[in-house]
């Protein structure tokens, strides 16, 4: 059995700036709304707090690899991808400029969620599930061996798939 390898997700500069700015704006808005008082102000402040808190549970924390499967860990759960069902492809970085967010974050706590984008220079839209916090480095695209499965983008060490132990 191969040893388990771990990769702690790094944040790129845009993710750090975006997350910090959004949290500052939400904090100021929540304080202002609660100081105003009134039911609608408190409801709006609560919705803003939920907007700030829920992504903490959706962003990936780390990725592990045991030679047979990739495990993406989140705060309260994990997703397991068997490499018998996917082919890993290392990509230099992925661009979100021509991508459409279906239910996704474009930098707030990373680039997680469901995206529609052109992959590998193909001239058709692909749907992919992204669990990344950096789009500049260590991006792995899991291409399904069966058409019925979705494509997955995550951060992991590209050397895991190019060297033999």
Language model: regions and residue ranges:
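Alpha-helical transmembrane segments of multipass membrane proteins
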Residues: 30, 52-53
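Short aromatic/basic micro-patch
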Residues: 64, 80, 153-155
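N-terminal membrane-targeting/pre-transmembrane regions
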Residues: 1-36, 141, 148-150
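Hydrophobic alpha-helical transmembrane segments
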Residues: 34-48
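A short, polar/proline- and glycine-enriched secondary-structure boundary/capping micro-motif
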Residues: 17, 81-85, 162-165
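Non-transmembrane, membrane-adjacent beta-strand/coil modules in membrane-associated proteins
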Residues: 2-3, 73-148
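Cytosol-/stroma-facing membrane-proximal "stalk/adaptor" domains immediately downstream
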Residues: 143-165
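Transmembrane-cytosolic junction motif
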Residues: 53-77
């Amino acid at each position: 059995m191969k040893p388990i390898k771990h990769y702690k997700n790094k944040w790129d500069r845009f993710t750090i700036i975006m997350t910090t700015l959004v949290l500052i704006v939400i904090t100021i808005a929540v304080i202002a709304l609660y100081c105003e008082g009134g039911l609608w102000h408190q409801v709006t402040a609560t919705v803003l707090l939920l907007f700030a808190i829920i992504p903490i549970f959706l962003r990936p924390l780390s990725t592990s690899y045991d030679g047979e499967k990739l495990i993406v860990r989140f705060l309260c759960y994990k997703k397991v991808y068997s490499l018998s069902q996917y082919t890993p492809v290392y990509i230099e970085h992925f661009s979100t400029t021509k991508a459409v967010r279906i239910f996704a974050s474009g930098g707030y706590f990373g680039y997680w969620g469901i995206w529609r984008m052109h992959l590998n220079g193909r001239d058709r839209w692909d749907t992919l599930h992204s669990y990344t916090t950096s789009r500049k480095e260590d991006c792995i695209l899991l291409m399904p061996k069966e058409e019925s499965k979705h494509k997955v983008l995550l951060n992991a060490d590209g050397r895991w798939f190019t060297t033999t132990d």
